[in-house]
Every structure is written in C-alpha cells, then in structure tokens.
C-alpha cells in the first residue's frame, strides 16, 4: 500500500487526529501487508481498523485523480508545507487537502468568523476591517459560509488581497453553492481552499464546529 493511499484511508477515520495519525501513517508505510490485526497493533480500535480497510477503492482512485490536477495537494502534518499555526492547536488535523497556493498557508493570517445573519453594522465594519488589513499584506482566513465569512473573503479580494477558505466539507463541494464564484476568485488571486475532510464529504452540520 503506497503512502498516499495510507493517508487517504487514515483521513477517513473521523476520530483520528494529529500526532496519532502521523505516527500510524509512518508505521504502516513500513509494513509488508496491512490487515485488521496490524492496524490494531498501532492502537486503532477494531471499528477504526474496519473503517480504514473499508474505505472505497473508488474514493481512493478519484482522490488520486484529483491530486494529479495543478495546485491540488495532500499535506500531511509532518510536511514542511503544513500550516505551522495549526500544530499549536489541540487535536490538529493529521493531514489537509489544499487547492491553491501553498505559500498562502505560511503567510501572516487573521481568522474572521461571524454571524450568517449579520447586521448592516457588522457587514460595514467587517468589510472595512478586512479591507484595511488585506491592503497591508494580511491574509484573511474564513470559512466561506454565508454572512460575515463571505464579507471577509470579498473584502480581501476587493483590494487585491489574499484570502484562505477553510471548509467544513470535502473540496469536491463548494458550500454554499452561491459562493462557488467567490471560491474561484479567491484561487485566482493567490489564495487557497483547505479541508481536513475527505474530498467527497458533504457539508454535515457536526463537521462545522470541528472546522472552526
């Protein structure tokens, strides 16, 4: 089993994060074969081992095809390209899918979050705040959601700044759909789309707190 496939299978285990994922990935890469017994030797539960082994071959093949496209990346947590800020968080993602410019992940960033049903006051000051910072080289990072997230991304792009969108679903889906043009503009201006979830994961409500 090649390293990339190991990472893809481990990313499908929703309760596996950070140091544990990296440790298990490196250990599995050295094994001549991988089965449920071998997986449980790493500390995975039987259920987690079954999830690893049952990850669909079709999903693996489609993910590998996705990674062949320009500016499509799979970034393990031990990669030099992994965002250093994330390593300081509890239960950081063991790997990330990234579409766009990797150097944006190492830029000075401000994370902006807010209400989906914002007030005119929130929109006005959110836009002004993000525009001002973006003109000074700060990368605006948000979640591509309706409301203040969209305001933040658009404000950065309006002044030719850079913005990063961290999604609560796989990168095969832009959610909400109305923000597909916004995501495209973000990529055109040197930003990135980032997700810790497998490419086909839909926008499920319980993933958004994890994304935040």
Give the role of each language-model region.
Residues 1-81:
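Short, small/acidic-rich helices and loops at N termini and domain boundaries
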Residues 1-4, 74-212:
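Glycine-biased, small-residue-rich flexible motifs in mid-sequence functional cores and linkers
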């Amino acid at each position: 089993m090649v390293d990339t496939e190991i990472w893809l299978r481990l990313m499908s285990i929703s309760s596996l994060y950070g140091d544990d994922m990296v440790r298990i990935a490196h250990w599995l890469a050295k094994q001549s074969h991988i089965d449920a017994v071998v997986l449980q030797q790493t500390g995975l539960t039987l259920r987690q081992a079954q999830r690893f082994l049952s990850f669909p071959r079709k999903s693996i093949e489609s993910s590998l095809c996705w990674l062949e496209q320009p500016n499509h990346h799979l970034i393990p947590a031990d990669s030099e390209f992994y965002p250093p800020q994330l390593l300081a968080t509890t239960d950081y993602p063991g790997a990330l899918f990234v579409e766009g410019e990797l150097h944006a992940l190492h830029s000075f960033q401000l994370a902006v979050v807010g209400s989906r049903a914002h007030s005119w006051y929130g929109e006005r000051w959110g836009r002004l705040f993000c525009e001002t910072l973006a003109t000074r080289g700060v990368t605006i990072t948000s979640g591509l959601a309706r409301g203040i997230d969209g305001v933040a991304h658009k404000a950065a792009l309006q002044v030719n700044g850079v913005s990063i969108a961290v999604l609560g679903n796989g990168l095969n889906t832009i959610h909400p759909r109305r923000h597909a043009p916004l995501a495209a503009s973000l990529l055109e201006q040197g930003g990135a789309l980032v997700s810790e979830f497998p490419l086909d994961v839909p926008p499920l409500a319980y993933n958004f707190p994890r994304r935040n």
